Amino acid sequence: MDLPVQPPIEPMLAKAQVKVPDEAGVWSYEPKWDGFRALVFRDGDDVVLQSRNGKDLGRYFPELLDALRDELVEKCVLDGEVVVPRDIAGRVRLDWESLSQRIHPAASRIKMLAEQTPAHFIGFDALALGDRSLLKEPFRVRREALAEAVDNKRWCHVTRTSEDPALGTEWLKTFEGAGLDGVIAKRLDGPYLPGKREMVKVKHHRDADCVAMGYRIHKSGDGIGSILLGLYRDDGELQMVGGAASFTAKDRIKLLAELEPLREGDEMREGDPSRWNSAADKRWTPLRPEKVCEVAYDQMEGNSVEGRRFRHAVKFLRWRPDREPSSCTFDQLDTPLNYDLYDVLEEQ
């Protein structure tokens, strides 16, 4: 490929916040799509669809490679999301389950799913157009290039944007019904910084991508009782930050079958005693740190990185086959608004 920006390249990332930034004239707002992050490199008939972690997504979405050749300009590098929309109860919504099923080793199954639930590409940034790199250009310039690069036909689209903070906040509520994931804010004058958390994301819940580093068997003896979760510190150590529990009986058995192949021999480790139940068995089975899950949580506790953990048990949302374990770090976590206690109380 003869492009000014070559694969692989890390996408620019987002830092979670609890509130949509509202400085007028500073930010551009757009929906947060619930799919697989993807970078598209096109040079004539050569098309590469790269995942967030630098891997080739093209083999899983062959129908999309054809669409990208047909609906993008001949020479470009775009950032966007691969999604699968489906008609669900009379409305078109994003379907995460259909999307995640595409990450499968069997080419025959991929071919069948490509016909049954074809994928779309949603473009939301441009890294290059023609022979010109746009990495150092402000987003307002890259946005114009994106509109020029995509011929909105059937499978490739450009996401909506607005510079109105009130509309960005409204989208956080209104677009949830279509299966979207929240709102992204980008600095209008900001360059594209690969691998840096320069964008802001505001989601409908606080979530985190965690490494499944171990599990405990359910007290009944059948299936998974809890999945133990880890995040990588800056020194490269995987730190346990809590666990996800409260699975149905059916899911407990299914999760055990999914996690058993990752066991590190027959080793069992002793866990910290429970502050709620001194009789609870806290032994756990360690796993190779290869599988990533998305969880929803309420708060973190602890003042140092070494002591930070989820305050309560978290909710398991889904596996993230598009995530690398090494990307599960503390810097993805939401930073709560900084309030002094007395600022919350009524003035006397």
UniProtKB/Swiss-Prot annotation:
Its cofactor is a divalent metal cation. It comes from Mycolicibacterium smegmatis (strain ATCC 700084 / mc(2)155). It catalyses: ATP + (deoxyribonucleotide)n-3'-hydroxyl + 5'-phospho-(deoxyribonucleotide)m = (deoxyribonucleotide)n+m + AMP + diphosphate. Belongs to the ATP-dependent DNA ligase family. This is DNA ligase C1. One of its GO terms (molecular function) is DNA ligase (ATP) activity. The active site is at residue 32. GO terms for biological process: DNA recombination; DNA repair. It comes from the Bacteria. Disruption phenotype: Not essential; a double ligC1-ligC2 mutant grows normally, no effect on NHEJ. In a triple deletion with ligD NHEJ on blunt-ended plasmid is 90-fold impaired. In quadruple ligB-ligC1-ligC2-ligD deletions NHEJ on blunt and 5'-overhangs is 0.22 and 0.12% of wild-type respectively, only 4-fold decrease in 3'-overhang NHEJ. Keywords: Ligase.
